[in-house]
Amino acid sequence: MNPVNPLRTAVITGSSSGIGLELTRQLLKDQWKIIALNRSAFPADDRVIQSALSSGQLRSIQANFTNYASLRSALDQIRSQTDSIDVLFNNAGGSTSTLQHSDQGRELHFELQTVVPYIIYRELYESLRQGRMKTVVNTSSTAFRMLKAFDLDTLERPASFKKLFGPYAASKLALSLWTAEAASKAMADGIRLLSVDPGGNNTLRSNKTSGLPFYIKPVMKLFFSHPSRGASLLHDAVLGSVKHDSGAFLVNNKAARLRFHEQGSTILQRVHEIYEQNYLNT
């Protein structure tokens, strides 16, 4: 006998704090089954999270996202734990205070926030095809609206560094560009791709060096929303009353125009090249 209303399954990256943690709480409340892929462990004093871990409704896998051996091991674990995925939330990210590089030698924001979400999407593609909702939500940002120029060479090898409005913003734009570019091909298999700006959220943590400009911090503390607001925007992109077209970039749950959209094919070609030549052959 088939179960009535079986649990839907979501994979959420970057869910041990901030927006991702709030999204995890929301989906647990809605009776989703969640596989969390994080660099850090969940808070030990969060009773809701720890209860879900104990019951098996929430499963936690840890990995260094920008180390391909570590990432591959984690994705293998996910595939071994579920045959189908309803929604993939590519939420892991962050902004650094200095220019840094990944284990593969690429600028860290580009690796973590542009390339790795594509790798995760490709590696979980067959599981998404088997899901009922077949949706990918990539967490983006409107920070890229401040960019005056954008190109692939600068994205991979920036000559200078600027907090928030430099490599961070460029990598989020590139994420939304490949999302839009890959959407039509994915729809042939019924998979819908979205990139979503979660808005301004107070995600400051006292134990972490901030990649924000100094003048943003007091504004964030005073005026930015609790991370549950951003989590709700990610949640509603999939489960809200409006069904958005695949490839859309959403701001306040409405489709918005992407700048530099003519470079989408170049960005998609590059991340796919990295996936095939670097990730698959590592």
Q: How does the language model describe each region?
A:
Residues S97-H101, R129, M133-A188, D197-G211:
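Catalytic loop of short-chain dehydrogenase/reductase
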Residues S195, K217-L258, S265, Q269-E273, ...:
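C-terminal helical subdomain
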Residues N91-S97:
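Conserved NAD(P)H cofactor-binding loop of Rossmann-fold oxidoreductase domains
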Residues F110-L124, V137, S171, F223-H226:
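Short alpha-helix in the Rossmann-fold core of NAD(P)-dependent oxidoreductases
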Residues A52-A69:
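Rossmann-fold cofactor-recognition segment
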Residues T98-L112:
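Short alpha-helical oligomerization interface
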Residues S16-S17:
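Conserved glycine-rich cofactor-binding loop
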